[in-house]
Regions:
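Terminal amphipathic alpha-helical/low-complexity segments used for targeting or macromolecular assembly
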Residues: 21-117, 246-247, 251-253, 257-295
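Intrinsically disordered, low-complexity regions enriched in polar/acidic and amide residues
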Residues: 6-7, 25
């Protein structure tokens, strides 16, 4: 006969309840996305609000790592798109006299001191439905879109954008003017993923499902897309497409802007970011100095 102490039984019951609730939400979202009603009911709006709350606290996310592989949670993207479909344009007031207009299902995210997020005054904004961990610093102006996930210790510098569903790891430095592209559709398309301890230089752009693995350095002015060839000068070869039909920047890689001659006309050059080296003590010291300056 199986016997469990009361506290173990309660823990198992709570875990089962959470799992069941998560599966129920997923099924309801998929059903609602595939069979859009003619009118949105109070029950539909309650489901979306519960979904949004789960996004806000990081309980669910649009993409997550399982057994070392990044997996897109398509149903989460479906839920976000439901919010756009369901919402009606409304007026929001910002400050004393500033008005802006957006869907009534997707207001600006609100923060409190208890969130332990440093938000320097001057015009930053985050859309409801993004997750921002404690210990994150946001310099003005910056924008974080719905579905984005930003882990602890990360710095979002001035004029930076974290797009919809983009995933940003721990202790990442997004320098001024860095753009981390977002994606909602196609549903199955992987968002941009910036793993832990990555340094992204100023005026960079990373788009179209690129993965930047841990401790990589993306130099200022580098633009990386799924259609831009990337050359590894250390291994003397071009990066190949990964399973997400995009590129994965290897861990510790240092990537700088570059170019190569066009095949059709070698008198002209096209963009080609170059991995010039992999991180060493000199690179680490430069990154550590940047981290010290922001504390």
């Amino acid at each position: 006969e199986l016997w469990l102490p009361a506290q173990h039984f309660r823990a198992c019951l709570n875990a089962f309840t959470k799992l069941s609730k998560g599966i129920w939400m997923q099924q309801e979202i998929i059903e609602l996305y595939n069979n859009q009603p003619k009118t949105w009911t109070a029950e539909h709006k309650a489901l979306f609000n519960e979904f949004l709350s789960a996004l806000n606290i990081g309980k669910i996310r649009s993409c997550e790592k399982e057994n070392g592989i990044w997996k897109v949670n398509e149903w989460v993207k479906m839920g976000i798109l439901i919010g756009f479909r369901m919402g009606e344009l409304t007026t929001y007031q910002w400050g004393m006299d500033k008005l802006f207009f957006d869907k009534d299902t997707l207001p600006e995210k609100q923060f409190s001191l208890d969130d332990k997020i440093r938000i320097v005054p001057g015009g930053s904004s985050a859309r409801n439905g993004c997750y921002i961990s404690s210990g994150v610093t946001i310099m003005p102006p910056a924008y974080i879109n719905i579905g984005a996930y930003i882990d602890s210790g990360t710095l979002i510098d001035s004029h930076s954008l974290v797009g919809s569903c983009a995933q940003v790891g721990k202790n990442v430095h997004l320098s001024a003017g860095a753009i981390i592209g977002g994606v909602l559709e196609p549903i199955g398309m992987r968002p941009v993923i910036i793993e832990d301890d990555v340094f992204v230089g100023g005026n960079t752009g990373i788009y179209e499902g690129i993965i930047v693995q841990s401790k990589a350095v993306i130099a200022s002015g580098t633009v990386i897309t799924a259609s831009t060839p990337i050359y590894d000068s250390i291994r003397e070869k071009f990066l190949e497409y990964d399973t997400g039909k995009s590129f994965t920047i290897p861990a510790n890689a240092v990537v700088v802007p570059g170019s190569r001659p066009m095949k059709s006309n070698p008198n002209f050059q096209i963009a080609c970011p170059i991995i010039i080296k992999y991180r060493d003590n000199k690179t680490d010291k430069a990154v550590e100095l940047e981290q010290a300056l922001r504390k």
